[in-house]
């Protein structure tokens, strides 16, 4: 599973995006922060949505996952202890990309583009026509329908 955040600054929102490696099935959850507690909750919701825990999860260098690269030698990173304990508890391996190599997570990066331009921008326009703004509640309700019927 490849995991990333995508930011929507005009709406003061971020979206947690998880894309499975082989099927490319994706899960999206809109949030108002990218704190460790939010990241853990989003993972649990993604695992529930997919019906199980992925064997490996791939991340970029987000501070909620990795504190310092190569802290204990090449390829031996200092991980956020809360996140490391969470991964052990759930039973998945943590993999991290090399810095500035977002293409390593190409599946989730491609889906982020699709989410932004096929879903989020369309939702903003649809809601603006009714004098509404995108918020966590309406974005999460609509994105689940979109994931199940379109994406």
Task: Label every model-predicted segment.
Residues 91-151:
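Charged alpha-helix within mobile-element recombinases
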Residues 28-56, 76-77:
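Active-site beta-loop-alpha junctions of metal-dependent nucleic acid enzymes
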Residues 53-74:
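Acidic/histidine-rich, metal-coordinating catalytic segments
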Residues 24-29, 67:
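Short small-residue beta-strand/loop micro-motif enriched in glycine and branched aliphatics
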Residues 71-76, 111-115:
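Short secondary-structure boundary/capping segments
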Residues 75-94:
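Two-metal-ion acidic nuclease core segments, chiefly of the RNase H-like superfamily
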Residues 1-26, 35-41, 88:
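Mobile-element integrase/transposase regions
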């Amino acid at each position: 599973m490849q995991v990333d955040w995508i930011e929507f600054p005009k709406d003061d929102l971020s979206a947690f995006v998880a894309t499975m490696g082989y099927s490319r099935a994706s899960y999206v959850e809109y949030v108002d922060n990218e704190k460790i507690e939010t990241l853990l909750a989003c993972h649990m919701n993604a695992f529930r949505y997919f019906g199980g825990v992925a064997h490996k999860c791939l991340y970029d260098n987000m501070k909620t996952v990795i504190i310092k690269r190569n802290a204990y030698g090449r390829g031996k990173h200092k991980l956020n202890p809360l996140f490391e304990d969470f991964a052990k508890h759930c039973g998945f391996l943590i993999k991290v990309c090399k810095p500035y190599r977002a293409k390593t997570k190409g599946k989730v990066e491609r889906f982020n583009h699709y989410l932004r331009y096929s879903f989020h921008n369309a939702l903003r326009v649809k809601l603006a026509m009714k004098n509404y703004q995108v918020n966590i509640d309406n974005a999460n309700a609509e994105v689940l329908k979109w994931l199940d019927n379109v994406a």
